[in-house]
């Protein structure tokens, strides 16, 4: 499949799941790139949770609204969300509306802060678990997210 827009020459070597410009941009700029900052890691973990049972394209389309409604996945802001916030989010059609996934996002923010506190006390945080130079994955094997 060849994909290209504007001045960009079409590429033939995209994976089969890349079917449109949004997925192409994601593949070219984010796929396989390690996420090393706290906010980015929290966003990725939470969006992967929302994606469960759905396509990643669905999440990509809704990601701007997720960022807006979930305080840009800043953990210190997310942990302040209340039951009223959960109810408000359940009414917003711009995101995937699943009570358990919304509640898990708030819980993940709390756990992120706990990891940060552990790191300040000498423990490692999630950033200590990614491979700094990446890892080559043989063709046909699944890729790592981190």
Regions found by a protein language model. Give the residues of each.
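HhH-family (HhH-GPD) DNA N-glycosylase catalytic core used in base-excision repair
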Residues: 1-146
């Amino acid at each position: 499949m060849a994909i290209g827009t504007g001045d960009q020459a079409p590429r033939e070597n995209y994976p089969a799941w890349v079917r449109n410009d949004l997925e192409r941009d994601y593949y070219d700029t984010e796929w396989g790139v390690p996420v090393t900052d706290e906010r980015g890691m929290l966003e990725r973990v939470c969006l992967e949770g929302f994606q469960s049972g759905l396509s990643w394209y669905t999440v990509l389309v809704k990601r701007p609204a997720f960022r807006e409604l979930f305080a840009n996945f800043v953990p210190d802001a997310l942990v302040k969300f209340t039951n009223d916030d959960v109810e408000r989010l359940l009414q917003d059609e711009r995101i995937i509306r699943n009570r358990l996934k919304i509640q898990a996002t708030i819980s993940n923010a709390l756990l992120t802060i706990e990891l940060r506190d552990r790191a300040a006390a000498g423990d490692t945080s999630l950033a200590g678990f990614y491979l700094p130079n990446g890892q080559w994955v043989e063709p046909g094997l699944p890729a790592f997210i981190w």
